[in-house]
A protein has these predicted regions:
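Polytopic alpha-helical membrane-helix bundles and their juxtamembrane interface segments
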Residues: 1-92, 97-306
């Protein structure tokens, strides 16, 4: 293992490397487990499993990079006057995995795509601002910190209020599952700016302490959260099947009923009325002025004209 200079430098030592390797192992093991569980389910019930497995897969790659002493640089710390090791690989991880974590929750709530977009956009801005602040060598780093905290406040409001309304509208066990998971993730995520303020910000804790703190938060936010999603699988599946039978479809972040054949009304011309009649279906009545007519078709509980 390569030796980093320690005089005048705040860098990771042996305890930190051990934490990185252990965290990598947990992430990789969880990725295999999540994917194995997901593949046992019907295709229509796999979206949460795929999302959760992808989260820990990306995190495992990032932790492997950091455990192998990569993905880092040294930046002058304005507080303390020394050089501090900053892991940019951590931010690359977060810019992919935190939107996926939010997507996991927002899929559960089946919230409108507009709501999902501004919540996820605030998250991406928060991560980028954290990176900019971490590598900044002036007092302006605290400006990035303040803006990042504001973005996290926006995320919290979106999860606790806006997305919660969508989850409550679904009813059943989903609203309770969402409420618990949203509260868990919202509270947990506020631990990140606290660690950032002590590490990249004020430079008052060691690099090893920073590694341990971030690893603990990541394990809680990705591994534990992932197992919570897996454990809630029967409730989620039962709710989806019930909604499908009611003609509401499998709720999606894009459209609450895009997967339901009962809730989609299509308009299509009937080119050959004679062929319709031979199949035992009603034929088109000619429209006004000799134009093509229409046929009544039952779509779920509604009757429309195609």
């Amino acid at each position: 293992m390569a030796q980093h200079p320690t005089s005048g430098y705040v860098s990771t030592t042996r305890p930190g490397w051990i934490v990185y390797w252990v965290t990598f192992g947990l992430m990789a093991f969880s990725a295999v487990c999540f994917m194995a569980i997901t593949l046992t389910k019907p295709q229509r019930h796999r979206k949460h499993g795929y999302c959760t497995a992808l989260i820990v897969t990306i995190a495992s790659v990032a932790y492997y990079a950091m455990a192998s002493e990569g993905g880092a640089t040294y930046t002058y710390a304005i507080h303390g006057g020394n050089m501090r090791q900053i892991y940019w690989a951590r931010y690359v991880d977060w810019v992919f995995t935190t939107p996926l974590l939010l997507l996991d929750l927002l899929l559960l709530a089946a919230c409108p795509i507009g709501t999902a977009m501004w919540i996820i956009a605030a998250d991406v801005f928060m991560i980028i601002l954290g990176l900019f602040g971490g590598v900044n060598t002036h007092k302006f780093k605290w400006g990035y910190y303040a803006m990042g905290c504001f973005c996290e406040l926006i995320i919290s409001i979106g999860l606790v209020f806006n997305a919660m309304r969508s989850a409550m509208a679904r009813g059943g066990g989903i609203s309770k599952v969402y409420a618990g998971m949203a509260a868990y993730l919202t509270i947990l995520w506020w631990g990140y700016p606290i660690v950032w303020g002590l590490a990249e910000g004020a430079n008052v804790i060691s690099s090893d302490a920073e590694v341990a703190a971030y690893a603990g938060l990541d394990i809680a936010a990705k591994v534990f959260f992932g197992w919570m999603i897996m454990a809630a699988g029967p409730i989620i599946t039962a709710q989806q099947d019930r909604e499908y039978k009611e003609g509401k479809g499998y709720p999606s972040i894009l459209d609450a009923s895009i997967d339901s054949p009962l809730s989609i009304t299509q308009t299509q011309p009937i080119a050959n009325p004679a062929a319709q009649a031979t199949r035992g279906l009603p034929t088109m009545e000619p429209g006004a002025n000799g134009t093509a007519g229409s046929v009544p078709v039952e779509t779920g509980n509604l009757q429309t004209v195609v």
